[in-house]
Amino acid sequence: MKLLLLTLAALLLVSQLTPGDAQKCWNLHGKCRHRCSRKESVYVYCTNGKMCCVKPKYQPKPKPWMF
């Protein structure tokens, strides 16, 4: 039982220490990926050439035209 708990603790520690799946972008609200998910859209491109996938609620709203 102790070996099982030690193994689980080690796996939890390793999973917290390894970096995430994607680089952060757009003020930490987006992720740099090759493809965006359905709920995300591309607003800018990352420095590594990938797309910065951002959820629409974090993208700036377009301002109306002033005449």
Curated annotation (Swiss-Prot):
Biological process, per Gene Ontology: defense response to bacterium; innate immune response
Gene Ontology, cellular component aspect: extracellular region
Disulfide-bonded cysteines: 25-52, 32-46, 36-53
Subcellular location: Secreted
Protein name per its UniProtKB record: Beta-defensin 36
InterPro entries: Beta-defensin (IPR050544), Beta_defensin_dom (IPR025933)
Keywords: Antibiotic, Antimicrobial, Defensin, Disulfide bond, Secreted, Signal
